[in-house]
Design a protein with these regions (language model features):
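N-terminal module of bacterial RNA polymerase sigma factors
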Residues: 1-27, 34
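Sigma70-family region 2
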Residues: 10, 50-65, 84-86
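Conserved catalytic core of Hanks-type protein kinase domains
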Residues: 23, 35, 72-73, 81
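Structural recognition of an alpha-helix C-terminal capping motif at a helix-to-coil junction
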Residues: 30, 44-51, 64-76
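Arg/Lys-rich amphipathic alpha helix in sigma70-family domain 2
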Residues: 75-92
Length: 95
């Protein structure tokens, strides 16, 4: 087994998935809350992100790549939510 294979993070492994979920959820929640101050929405966005990781069985080369991916994904998901919410509010205001 090579060094790269030892570092690889495989989200199709249930134990590894649970460990990473527990390790990152609180920090990602705090990070997302800086964009969206609604705890329920933030938790939904994070849940969706982790469900996608689980369903796809994502693999990451190492912890740094995983961390960067998670934070970038949370940021993008928050910005998408904000954009969509503004559009929805704008359409409702037109009526």
């Amino acid at each position: 087994m090579t060094k790269t294979e030892k570092q690889r993070i495989d989200f199709s492994d249930a134990k590894r998935f649970k460990a990473e979920y527990e390790a990152y959820f609180s920090a990602l929640k705090y990070f997302a809350f800086r964009y969206i101050e609604d705890e329920e929405v933030v938790c939904d966005l994070l849940q969706d992100l982790f469900v996608k990781l689980w369903e796809r069985g994502e693999m990451f080369e190492n912890e740094m790549v995983l961390k960067a991916y998670l934070y970038r994904s949370v940021r993008n998901n928050c910005l998408t939510y904000i954009r969509d919410n503004r559009r929805r509010e704008h359409r409702l205001a037109e009526y």
